[in-house]
Amino acid sequence: PGWHIECSAISLKHLGEHLDIHCGGIDNAFPHHTNEIAQSEAYIGHKWCNYWFHVLHLNTNSGKMSKSTGEFLTVSLLEEKGYNPLAYRFFCLQSHYRKSLVFSYENLDNAQGAFNKLLAKIAALKDDENEAIDEAAVKELTEKFKAALDNDINTSLGITVLYDVLKAKTNDKTKLALLAEFDKVLSLNLLDEAKKLKEDKKEEASSV
């Protein structure tokens, strides 16, 4: 029981008595989340969470990734191996949460390559103070991004909208504003990472 009670206590203390979205692994659905709901709502006297979603397991080619098998990832391990942890996040976001995701370093290499290419395209954008925000483009692309996330939190479709922004026939200032807004959901730190990539390339060029 302590496991269930501590989660209710922590979330009520730090997040308040009403949550919009609560997520977890598919193995948390029962009995952990059902117990959380029962005890939290009995305590606060009203509905606790609006939405629940449960992510399927991260697997390797040999099966489920878990501590018990000795096969699991940590951010520090990825960093030790030279990976940007945000590339791993990008890798995860490219799959739907209802699908089991197969991890391999080859797949992560592909994701990191794609993430770096995305950052390079963003780094090439220029924020011109004299340009005005294209409100029509903002409306169209924001609706497209929201539709992707409203479709059962389809993050992979949301990622494709980032590329739609980059290809859109609008000015760079608008593109940067849209990317910053969408990144509030995706948390890929796109603009800062793109700026860092740009600065690293300048340093490399100056050292040659």
Feature locations, PLM:
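Alpha-helical recognition segments enriched in aromatics with Gly/Pro capping
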Residues: P1-L125
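Conserved nucleotide- and phosphate/pyrophosphate-binding catalytic cores
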Residues: K67-V208
